[in-house]
């Protein structure tokens, strides 16, 4: 394979991120110019966001030829589909659908779809967005060693890693976590408990909230291994105000309770004691 080709001029998040993924996957240079005769027919050139053709088998990923009533889609969507990542990305990357809307419908229609004032859209930009897109737009060619190309490779690698490891993490949570009911009567709390396993994942609490979203379980709080010690972390789920962990700050085996009451750390490992602490934290 030779290169990734995308249009010159201004750059947007969709073509930038599509190129990031392709750089991470194939390690190719990027050419920023209009396609020349034969580029679309050359399987060694991946044509992104330009060319008027969506032919993945030939490496062509443009969406501008789709009719106006076509569902919101962008070049990033097409590349994610080709890489087999689209469904997970739509599920786990909340920013993807607004990106599709923004690129295919524009900022005003996107604001209306989101139910926000149109002025809010510009408030969501940051120097990270502005600088990376501007520096990318200024380039005619990018290759390994160029600072912009290297940052794009890192962005693509991190997105690949996030989607791959999150799916693995959800499978891990499903295999080990269980829902507990602690307390009695109206005082009952539903808690998702993640036991300590061997080996332990790097971040034991990672994926718990996503798992709850996927299963639709009604959960008040979480109990999970503390990655900094042998005990456990206790926290609210979705900032559930039925739990205030400042209420257990004075317990002998509680060594940390956040002043805002949403999380605590304990040296306790016995499940009965952990359940008792959750009940005592109930408002």
PLM regions with names:
Residues 121-201, 217:
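Acidic catalytic cores of enzymes that act on phosphate-bearing nucleotides/polynucleotides
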């Amino acid at each position: 394979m030779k290169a990734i080709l995308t249009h010159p001029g201004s750059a947007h998040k969709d073509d930038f991120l599509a190129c990031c993924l392709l750089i991470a996957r194939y390690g190719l240079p990027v050419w920023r110019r209009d396609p020349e005769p034969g580029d679309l027919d050359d399987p060694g050139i991946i044509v992104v966001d330009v060319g008027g053709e969506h032919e993945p088998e030939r490496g062509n990923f443009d969406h501008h030829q789709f009719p106006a009533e076509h569902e919101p889609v962008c070049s990033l969507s097409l590349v994610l589909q080709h890489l087999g990542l689209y469904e997970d990305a739509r599920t786990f990357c909340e920013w993807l659908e607004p990106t599709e809307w923004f690129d295919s419908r524009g900022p005003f229609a996107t604001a209306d779809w989101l139910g926000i004032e149109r002025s809010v859209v510009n408030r969501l930009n940051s120097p990270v967005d502005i600088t990376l897109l501007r520096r990318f737009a200024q380039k005619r060619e990018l290759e390994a060693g160029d600072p912009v190309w290297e940052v794009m490779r890192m962005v693509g690698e991190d997105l690949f890693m996030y989607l791959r490891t999150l799916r693995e993490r959800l499978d891990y949570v499903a295999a080990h976590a269980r829902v507990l009911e602690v307390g009695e009567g109206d005082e009952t709390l539903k808690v998702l408990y993640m036991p300590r396993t061997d080996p332990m994942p790097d971040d034991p609490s990672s994926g718990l909230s996503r798992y709850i979203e996927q299963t639709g379980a009604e959960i008040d709080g979480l109990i999970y291994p503390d990655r900094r010690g042998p005990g456990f972390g206790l926290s609210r789920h979705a900032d559930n105000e039925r739990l205030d962990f400042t209420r257990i700050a004075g317990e002998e085996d509680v060594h940390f309770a956040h002043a805002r009451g949403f999380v605590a750390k304990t040296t306790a490992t016995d499940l009965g004691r952990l359940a008792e602490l959750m009940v005592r934290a109930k408002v």
